[in-house]
Swiss-Prot record:
InterPro entries: Bin3-like, Bin3_C, BIN3_SAM-bd_dom, SAM-dependent_MTases_sf. It comes from the Eukaryota. GO terms for biological process: methylation; negative regulation of pre-miRNA processing. Belongs to the methyltransferase superfamily. Residues 34-254 form the Bin3-type SAM domain. GO terms for cellular component: cytoplasm. This is Pre-miRNA 5'-monophosphate methyltransferase. The lineage of its organism: Eukaryota, Metazoa, Chordata, Craniata, Vertebrata. Its EC number is 2.1.1.-. The gene is bcdin3d. Signal peptide: none annotated.
Length: 254
C-alpha cells in the first residue's frame, strides 16, 4: 500500500501472506468493508459540517485503497445509498483513492461504478515530491487547499516496517497537511509481529527496519500524540474497534 512498483506475482497469488507492502490481492475476502462501515456513521459528513446535496463539493482521499472495494462501499455509505448504481443522480462528493500496486489499481479502475465521482490512481505515499504534486493537482481542480476528509485504513504499519520510524511520522504529518479531517486506523503492534512472522515462514528476509524500530507498543497512541503535538490536529471521536481490534480515530484540524 505504500512503496515500490509491487506488482502481484505468482507467489503472492498462491500465498497472500507474501505481500510485504500490504498489497494483498484478496484483502476484502478476509476483511470485508462492513468491518469498518459498521462503525462509521452514515451521517459522518453531515456530523462534521459537510454536505453533498446542496451544491457544496466535498473532497475525500482514501490512502492505500487496494482494489477499491472499501472506497466504493464507503462512498455509498456516506451518501446513504445502499442501492446506489452508476445511473444514480450525481452527488457533489468526489473521492481520490490511491495505492502503490498498479495491478490492484487497475482492478479498482475496471470495477469502479462511479468514474465521474471516484478516481483511482497508482501512487507511492512515501514519495513526498510526487505524492504532494499529485494531490495538490487534484485539489486544484476543485479550488481547494485540502481534502475535507481523508481516510487511512491499515497503511501505517507497512510504511513503518518498510521505511522506519521517520517515515511513519512523516506519513502522519503528510496526511495532516492535506486534510481537514482524518479518519485513521493504525495497526496495533501485534500486527507488526504477525507480519514479520509470515515473512520468516516463507523463508524471506525480515523487514528492513523491524528490529530497529524505536516507536513500538500502543501504535494508535503514538499516532495520536504526533498528530496532536506536531500536526495541529485533535482527536474528536473514536468510533470503536473493528473485529480485528483496531480503533477508528477521527481527527480534526485545529
Amino acid at each position: 500500500m505504500e512503496a515500490h512498483d509491487a506488482h502481484v506475482n505468482s507467489e503472492e497469488s498462491e500465498n497472500p501472506g507474501a505481500a510485504p507492502y500490504g498489497n494483498f490481492i484478496n484483502y476484502y475476502t478476509f476483511n470485508p468493508p462492513e468491518n469498518r462501515l459498521s462503525l462509521i456513521p452514515e451521517a459522518l459528513l453531515q456530523n462534521i459540517g459537510f454536505t453533498s446535496g446542496d451544491g457544496e463539493r466535498v473532497l475525500m482521499l482514501d490512502v492505500g485503497c487496494n482494489s477499491g472495494d472499501l472506497s466504493v462501499a464507503l462512498y455509498k455509505h456516506l451518501l446513504n445509498k445502499e442501492a446506489c448504481t452508476s445511473d444514480s443522480p450525481r452527488q457533489e462528493l468526489y473521492m481520490l483513492g490511491f495505492d502503490l500496486d498498479q495491478d490492484l489499481i487497475l482492478r479498482a479502475q475496471t470495477s469502479n461504478p462511479f468514474p465521474q465521482n471516484i478516481q483511482f490512481i497508482p501512487l507511492d505515499i512515501t514519495d513526498d515530491t510526487e505524492s504532494r504534486a499529485v494531490l495538490q493537482a487534484f485539489l486544484g481542480k476543485f479550488g481547494c487547499s485540502r481534502f475535507h476528509l481523508s481516510t487511512c485504513f491499515a497503511v501505517t504499519m507497512w510504511v513503518h516496517l518498510n521505511h522506519g520510524d521517520a517515515a511513519f511520522l512523516s506519513l502522519l504529518s503528510r496526511l495532516a497537511s492535506h486534510s481537514e479531517y482524518l479518519l485513521l486506523e493504525a495497526q496495533p503492534w501485534k500486527c507488526y509481529r504477525s507480519a514479520a512472522r509470515r515473512l520468516r515462514k516463507l523463508g524471506r528476509s525480515d523487514f528492513d527496519h523491524f528490529k530497529a524500530l524505536k516507536i513500538r507498543g500502543d501504535m494508535a497512541a503514538h499516532a495520536r500524540e504526533h498528530l496532536e503535538k506536531q500536526c495541529s490536529m485533535e482527536l474528536v471521536q473514536c468510533f470503536g474497534n473493528t473485529s480485528w481490534d483496531r480503533s477508528l480515530l477521527l481527527f480534526r484540524r485545529q
